[in-house]
Structure formats: C-alpha cells, structure tokens
C-alpha cells in the first residue's frame, strides 16, 4: 500500500495490471425479439427439398427467420456492497463506464414441417462485466500550500509558482546589532523566511500521481463489445415486460447483501490509500486525555511583550545614523509596495488568462458539438436515402412475385385445359386423330414457355434481392464513414485547443521566469545595500571606539599633568627662562579612512544608489 509519506511496501510499477473495478454477474431474464425478414430464399446446408406426390404440385414460399435472443440490459449495476473507496490522490472527472457482453453458443431449433421451413435461434448471455477506467488527473485540482509554524508571521504572503531561492541572514556581533527586529526589516525578513519546499513537494506528488494514473490506464484491458453472429439486418425490436424475478433479486441484494471480507480487502489493497473503514481510526494527538501535549500558540503573548520592551529599549539606545535607518526603512517599504503591486498585477493577469482559457474551451466544445450534429444529420439523410432505395427494391421484388404468381396461375389453367383436352381426345379418338396431334404439340410448346417464364422470374427475384443487399451495405458503410469523419474532426479540434493552451502556458512560463529574474536582481540589490549599511555601521563603531580610546589617553595625560603640577608647587620656585616655551597640544591621529562627516558618506551612497534605481525604472 502507498501512504501519505510516499513510502511503499510493494513495487509501484508492475507488469500485472492494477484492478480498479468490480465484476458482477447476474442472470438476465428480460427478452427482446428480433425479426429478420427477407423476400428471397436463403440457401443453407440444411434445406427441405420439394417433393411431388402424383399430380399434386407443392410450391414453397421464402424462408422467414425468427430469432429470439435474450434482452441485454445496457445499464450499470452498481455493487450493493457498502465498501466504497472514495479517498484518492486525484479528482475523478467524467469517468465513462463500459459494459461488455458475452454470449453462449446459439441453440438452433428446426421445424419438422416442410411447408414453409423455419428455424429459431436463441442467444442467452452468461455474464456481463461493468468496469470503470482509471482515475484521470485534472489541472483544476486545488493546490494547498502548507508552511511550518516557524515561518508564519502576521504579514501573509500569497504563494506563487515562482521558486524563490533564499539565503540565511548573516549573523553579526551583539554590539553591532543596532537594527531591532520587526523595525523596518519586517517585510524583507518575512519574505526571505518563506519555505519553497512546500511548492516543490506539491509539484513532485502531482507528477507522481499523473505517472501512476498513466500506468494504470496502460495496463487496464479494454474489452470490446460482442457483435452479433447473424448476417441478417435488424428490422425491429419487441420489448417484453421485466420479470418479477429480477426485481426480487435486486431487493434481496439491497436488503441482505452477500459480502466476502477477505476478497474485498484484497481488492482494496490495490488502491493507493489504506482501507481506513476496516481499521481503527488514528487517535487525535490533541485529545482531552493528553493535557501535556496541548498545542502551543504560534506566538507566546509574554514573549511578544518582552520582545516589544526590548525593541523600545533598543530604539531609545539607537543614536547613530537615525537618518540612514530612516532611508533603509523607506527603501524596504518601497520594495514591499512594489512587490504587493506586482502580486496584484499577477492575480489580475491570472484571472484574465483563466477567463480566456475557459472561453476558448467553450468555443471549441461548441464547434465540436456542431460538427458532430452536422455529421449525424448527414448520416441520417444518407440512411433515409438507403432506406428509400431498399423500399424501392422491395417493391420491385413484389412486382416480380406478382408476375411469378400470374405465371403459376396460367400454368394451372393450362394444366386444367390439358386434362380436359386429354379427356376429350379419349372420347373422340377415332374421329379427331389429327386434332389430338396438334393439341399435343401446342401443349408441349406452352409447357416449355411456362418453365422458361418461371425460371426468368426466379432469376429476376434473386437479382433484385442481391441489389437490395448491396444497397443496404453501401448505406451502412456510408454511415460508418460519416461517423468516423465526425470523430476525426472532433479530435482535430480538441488537439488544436490543447495546442493553443500549451502555447499560452509556455508564454506564461517565460513571463514568470523573467519576473523571477527581476525579483532576484532586486533581492540581490537589497542584500548589497544591507551589507554596505552593516559595513558602514561597523566602521563607525570602530571610529567611535578609537575616539573613546584617544579621549581616555588624553584624560590620563591631563591627570598626570595635574599631578605633576601639584608636585611642582611643593618644590622651591625656579626661575624660568625669558623665552617662553610653547606647550604642544596632544595630536590625535585618526585612520586615513575616517571622514569628518560621520554618517554623511553613507547618506551620499544611498542617494547615489537611489538615483541609479530611478534611472533603471525610467529605462
């Protein structure tokens, strides 16, 4: 089984097809009577020969074939079992259900009568199987982005499909950490603390689900519909009422279903989710019995209060380069506003793109539907034409049959006349010998003409039947070609729509990559600004430390001078020279990199960078 962690205890890819359906077998008692009519004789291996008894003439009519196959219900019989697997990793969209039929060998019964010959064929279905194809993935699946608690903040940032590669903020010593947390750097810190791992894991699971669905579809056998074995066209259907036995069986299945737990568990084991219905539910880690494991809030109010006090204290202690900090705060706020405007623009573009895609799909579906309707209309017209041709052929066959009946009637009358003539010749044998010879010759000629007429009528009937069959086959072939053409046009329209959607997606990905590149450049620029500000703060701190050291040295020198003066006052007065000696003041040597303007250099750097940014925006 495959669980949420992605770990599997069996091979995910196997040559054995995955079972994703149920097979139900029920006896069917509903019947449909199909009548096959033909106006021409059907030649088969079993035929009834014409027998003549004495002077009696027997004429057989065309064979009438009557078949009575059992009715096959083309509806889906859902399993009454309460076992249902509804938790899947993908959405199920318009899963068509196919029904297959299997028939036993037809049983044929022959009538013992020879006038006319008939036979009956019955098809009894042994079972039928209904299955649902594998699950299909839809790109409309709602994507949920989860972030750890450590990355949450009061400012919510909408996740986007663009990957943002973040780097941790460089740590600085405590005495140089002048910038308080949450003051000015809140937007940038929250943006850099977002985790791209959730987006990556969502994309990985989506690709894995699509691959598994494709493998299941490849290994699922598609059972073809069983076709009828009779070569005769179906001309009509006769429906009989449903039997009470089927209704009783359905009620019994609903009220008292027969279940096989081991088999059901075996079937469920093929699904990518565990059978949570037959196992004990997982205990809630936050149940009342576990008081010690109660979830802690995201931010402790006491901790928040302490942080606020620390921030206020650092603000009071912050006395160096307040103007520079204001500039940094203004720059970061400007970057935050630009990012928010960019997100609003992306959201509007996404909505517009979704609307255009929906309209394109709707138009493609309408075109495909219209093409299918036109193809169906053309096929119906061709079928009507074929039916008219078949009716015309049937009328011609009927006319030929009437001609055959007239010929048979004439033959019967000739036979009666022949018998009367024979009787008359027997009575007047002595008187009309020459007349009898003439009548015999006329009777022979007339008989030959009757046989020739009968043979011609039979050949004409066979020819008309053959033409009708060819016309019907041509009509059926034309209808099938029209249906195939409509399906091909619909498929071409669908491929065109998919191609347009793919091109739109490629353009959108290119635009998103360009935006990602611009955003990364902006982040790098902000990081450089922050790095330069930290370097400037470190330099100023070093200068202050050097000034403090020099001041301490001056204070020590002054203290030594005062002590020396006090010692000199206690000694006798010594005459000083006439030329006064100038006292040299202590020289304070500063580094060459120290400037007298304090934070003005940092302000000049910021102004230069702002001017460069404005020039880039104008370009």
Curated annotation (Swiss-Prot):
Residues 602-619 have a biased composition (Acidic residues). The modification Phosphoserine is found at residues 79, 81. Residues 570-581 have a biased composition (Low complexity). Residues 285-304, 333-373, 389-504, 558-619 are annotated as: Disordered. Keywords: Phosphoprotein. Residues 393-418, 425-441, 448-504 have a biased composition (Basic and acidic residues). This is Uncharacterized protein CG45076. It comes from Drosophila melanogaster (Fruit fly). The lineage of its organism: Eukaryota, Metazoa, Ecdysozoa, Arthropoda, Hexapoda.
């Amino acid at each position: 089984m495959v669980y949420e962690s992605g770990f599997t205890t069996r091979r995910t890819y196997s040559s054995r097809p995955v079972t994703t359906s149920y097979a139900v077998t029920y006896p069917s008692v509903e019947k449909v009577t199909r009548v096959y009519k033909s106006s021409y004789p059907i030649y088969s291996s079993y035929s009834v020969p014409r027998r003549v008894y004495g002077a009696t003439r027997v004429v057989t009519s065309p064979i009438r074939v009557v078949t009575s196959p059992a009715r096959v219900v083309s509806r889906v019989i859902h399993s009454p079992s309460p076992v249902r697997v509804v938790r899947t990793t993908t959405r199920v969209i318009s899963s068509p259900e196919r029904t297959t039929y299997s028939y036993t060998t037809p049983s044929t019964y022959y009538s013992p009568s020879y006038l006319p010959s008939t036979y009956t064929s019955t098809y009894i279905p042994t079972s039928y199987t209904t299955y649902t194809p594998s699950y299909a993935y839809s790109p409309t699946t709602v994507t949920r982005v989860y972030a750890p608690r450590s990355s949450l903040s009061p400012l919510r940032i909408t996740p986007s499909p663009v990957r943002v590669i973040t780097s941790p903020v460089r740590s600085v010593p405590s005495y140089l950490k002048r910038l308080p947390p949450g003051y000015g750097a809140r937007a940038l810190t929250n943006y850099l603390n977002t985790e791209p791992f959730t987006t990556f894991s969502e994309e990985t699971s989506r690709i894995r689900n699509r691959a598994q669905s494709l493998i299941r579809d490849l290994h699922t056998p598609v059972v073809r519909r069983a076709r009828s074995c009779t070569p005769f066209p179906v001309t009509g259907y006769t429906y009989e009422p449903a039997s009470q036995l089927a209704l009783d069986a359905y009620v019994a299945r609903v009220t008292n279903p027969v279940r096989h737990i081991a088999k059901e568990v075996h079937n469920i084991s093929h699904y990518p989710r565990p059978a949570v219905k037959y196992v004990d539910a997982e205990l809630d880690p936050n149940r009342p019995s576990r008081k010690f494991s109660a979830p802690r809030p995201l931010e402790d109010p006491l901790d928040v209060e302490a942080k606020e006090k620390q921030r206020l204290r650092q603000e009071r202690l912050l006395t160096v380069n307040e103007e520079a900090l204001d500039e940094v705060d203004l720059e970061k706020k400007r970057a935050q506003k630009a990012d928010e405007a960019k997100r609003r623009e992306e959201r509007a573009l996404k909505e517009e793109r979704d609307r255009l895609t929906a309209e394109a799909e709707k138009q493609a579906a309408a075109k495909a539907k219209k093409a299918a309707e036109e193809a169906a209309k053309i096929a119906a017209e061709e079928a009507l034409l074929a039916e008219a041709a078949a009716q015309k052929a049937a009328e011609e066959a009927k006319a030929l049959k009437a001609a055959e009946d007239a010929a048979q009637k004439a033959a019967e009358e000739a036979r009666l006349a022949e018998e009367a003539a024979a009787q008359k010749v027997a009575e007047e044998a002595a008187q009309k010998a020459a007349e009898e010879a003439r009548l015999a010759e006329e009777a022979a000629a007339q008989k030959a003409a009757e046989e020739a007429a009968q043979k011609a009528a039979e050949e004409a009937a066979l020819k008309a039947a053959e033409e009708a069959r060819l016309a019907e086959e041509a009509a059926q072939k034309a209808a099938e070609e029209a249906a195939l053409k409509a399906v091909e046009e619909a498929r071409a329209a669908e491929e065109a729509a998919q191609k347009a959607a793919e091109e739109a997606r490629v353009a959108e990905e290119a635009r998103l990559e360009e935006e990602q590149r611009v955003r990364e450049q902006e982040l790098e620029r902000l990081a450089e600004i922050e790095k330069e500000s930290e370097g400037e703060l470190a330099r100023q701190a070093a200068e202050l430390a050097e000034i403090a050291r020099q001041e301490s040295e001056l204070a020590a020198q002054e203290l030594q001078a005062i002590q020396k003066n006090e010692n000199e006052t206690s000694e006798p007065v010594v005459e000083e020279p006439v030329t006064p000696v100038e006292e040299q003041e202590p020289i304070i040597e500063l580094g060459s990199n120290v400037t007298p303007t304090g934070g003005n250099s940092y302000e000049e750097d910021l102004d230069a960078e702002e001017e460069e940014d404005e020039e880039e925006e104008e370009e």
